[in-house]
UniProtKB/Swiss-Prot annotation:
The cysteine framework is C-C-C-C-C-C-CC. Residues 1-24 form the signal peptide. Keywords: Cleavage on pair of basic residues, Disulfide bond, Neurotoxin, Secreted, Signal, Toxin. Transmembrane segments: none annotated. It comes from Conus imperialis (Imperial cone). It is found in: Secreted. This is Conotoxin Im026. GO terms for cellular component: extracellular region. Probable neurotoxin. Expressed by the venom duct. One of its GO terms (molecular function) is toxin activity. Residues 25-59 form a propeptide.
């Protein structure tokens, strides 16, 4: 069966009107009316972002007290004044 574009459009419109009231309890009520925008309010960002969407930031370790290099976070070194120096410490920024 081969349909032209016009026939396809007419068929789609008829199907839309035929199934328009499937989810409603009364005539004219559709699934779009039932939602009352609750779905969109859930999607809005409220509070902190989701854990896997947080930005990763590099922190400067300068000024952190240490006794040996083991006390400093990775990629930092303990200098002669017993302070960690260098850029290090990737962490999730809240």
């Amino acid at each position: 069966m081969r349909l032209t574009t016009m026939h396809s459009v007419i068929l789609m419109l008829l199907l839309v009107f035929a199934f328009d009231n499937v989810d409603g309890d009364e005539p004219g009520q559709t699934a779009r009316d039932v939602d009352n925008r609750n779905f969109m309010s859930i999607l809005r960002s409220e509070g902190k972002p989701v854990h896997f969407l947080r930005a990763i930031k590099k922190r400067d370790c300068t000024g952190q007290a240490c006794t040996t290099g083991d006390n400093c976070p990775s990629e930092c070194v303990c200098n002669e004044h017993h302070f960690c120096t260098g850029k290090c410490c990737y962490f999730l920024h809240a």
